[in-house]
Curated annotation (Swiss-Prot):
One Pfam family it belongs to: Defensin_1
UniProt cross-references to SMART domains, sorted A to Z: Defensin_propep, DEFSN
Family: Belongs to the alpha-defensin family.
Keyword Disulfide bond in record: yes
Alphabetic keyword roster: Antibiotic, Antimicrobial, Defensin, Disulfide bond, Secreted, Signal
Annotated organism of origin: Oryctolagus cuniculus
Main location: secreted
Annotated protein name in UniProt: Corticostatin 1
Purpose: Microbicidal activity and inhibits corticotropin (ACTH) stimulated corticosterone production.
Subcellular location(s) per record: Secreted
Disulfide bond residue pairs: C62-C90, C64-C79, C69-C89
Annotated PANTHER family: ALPHA-DEFENSIN 1 (PTHR11876:SF28)
Keyword rRNA-binding annotated: no
First and last residue of the signal peptide: 1-19
Length: 93
């Protein structure tokens, strides 16, 4: 029983350290973004059918999540942290 408690404590400490490291890396990625990179981008394509591609507004608080966005946030693309791909989630307005 003591061994199980000790292993659980070590696992929790490792998970907490990993979460803190991930939080710092996300802050570094957000700080590296260029000023004005959160502006809207519209691309008009010519052809028989009229079409346009609009990149959603990503202003607000964003975070890189491992799998999916919670209900309080919306999907806003992908981000890379140390070569790993994460889902970018931004707060809803």
């Amino acid at each position: 029983m003591r061994t199980l408690i000790l292993l659980a404590a070590i696992l929790l400490a490792a998970l907490q350290a990993q979460a803190e490291l991930f939080s710092v890396n996300v802050d570094e990625v957000l700080d590296q973004q260029q000023p004005g990179s959160d502006q809207d981008l519209v691309i008009h394509l010519t052809g028989e059918e009229s079409s346009a591609l609009q990149v959603p507004d990503t202003k607000g608080i964003c975070a890189c999540r491992r799998r999916f966005c919670p209900n309080s946030e919306r999907f806003s693309g992908y981000c890379r942290v140390n070569g790993a791909r994460y889902v970018r989630c931004c707060s809803r307005r």
